[in-house]
Amino acid sequence: MASNSTADGKDRFFSALIYVIPLIDAFMFGGFLLQQFPVLQIIYLPIMPLLQFYYQFPFASFIIFIVLFMAVVRNNNISHFIRFNAMQAILIGILLSLFGLIVAYVIQPVFGQGLVTETLYNFAFLGALACGFFGIVQSVLGRYAEIPTISDAAYSQVRF
């Protein structure tokens, strides 16, 4: 779609900041990997206060979703660059939530807390980290982060 943009510094900053949400959502899947490789915990040191706030309130993720969707994605006064990145971060969060539900109610009852569950959690954690950091880097560079399928869904939801 659109690979380059004319995003100014403010748009780049806020677009990159929005991708902290998928990083926070991915934290719940990182338990196994963070125990095996404690050096990865460095990733979460800068956002630890946000992480504690986010998980302290049960409906924080839902409230943030509603606010981002209604106040940012659907607001035509905000640049398309920010709205697209907000929608993409929301979609990554939704995918992580759905994945968590599937693992909790389908995979774990069948396979237990074994290797399959641990592998799926590691996959979700690393995938979300990759998407989050890719989105941050692309936003800082002023480019649209083209993540297959997710970007297509984000483009279809964000009006020009």
Curated annotation (Swiss-Prot):
Keyword entries, A-Z: Cell membrane, Membrane, Transmembrane, Transmembrane helix
Short name of any one Pfam family annotated for the protein: TIC20
Membrane topology listed for this record: Multi-pass membrane protein
InterPro entries, per the entry: Tic20
Record localization: Cell membrane
Positions of transmembrane segments: 13-33, 53-73, 87-107, 122-142
GO CC annotations, alphabetized: plasma membrane
Chief location of this protein within or outside the cell: membrane
Keyword Membrane included in the entry's annotation: yes
Family under the similarity heading: Belongs to the Tic20 family.
Protein name, as recorded: Tic20 family protein
